[in-house]
UniProtKB/Swiss-Prot annotation:
Similarity section: Belongs to the bacterial ribosomal protein bL17 family.
Source organism of the structure: Hydrogenovibrio crunogenus (strain DSM 25203 / XCL-2)
GO molecular function: structural constituent of ribosome
Annotated GO biological process: translation
PROSITE patterns noted in UniProt: RIBOSOMAL_L17 (PS01167)
Keywords from the named record: Ribonucleoprotein, Ribosomal protein
Lineage: Bacteria, Pseudomonadati, Pseudomonadota, Gammaproteobacteria, Thiotrichales
InterPro entries for this protein: Ribosomal_bL17 (IPR000456), Ribosomal_bL17_CS (IPR047859), Ribosomal_bL17_sf (IPR036373)
Name of the protein this chain belongs to: Large ribosomal subunit protein bL17
Keyword Ribosomal protein: yes
Quaternary organization: Part of the 50S ribosomal subunit. Contacts protein L32.
Amino acid sequence: MRHRKSGRKLNRNSSHRKAMFRNMSASLFEHEMIKTTVAKAKELRGVAEPLITLAKQDSVHNRRIAFSRLRDKAAVGKLFSELGPRYESRPGGYVRILKCGFRPGDNAPMAYVELVDRPQVESTESED
């Protein structure tokens, strides 16, 4: 029986899963919005949100913890310089999951994962 077992395996071994979420969370912090499957998005939330909570207090110790989990110097820098101060007053819920249809190849349900309160990109269309 698998009662009270949390987390999805996603047809990967543990090292592959760990590397995948490490890369996905670094991409999320860099681009502030990524597209993935719904199952991966729900699992990514559990990886990314504690890192943002950690970044709310900037210290050498917290930076080292974040780097040990992300292994991406640029992502850790942005996490502590931009994202931590941005969510200083928010007690949680930094990630939003928006369902966006199905993937054409295998009909997998897809979703956008975005950071809440991210700056909106202005459209580049010229208004005539």
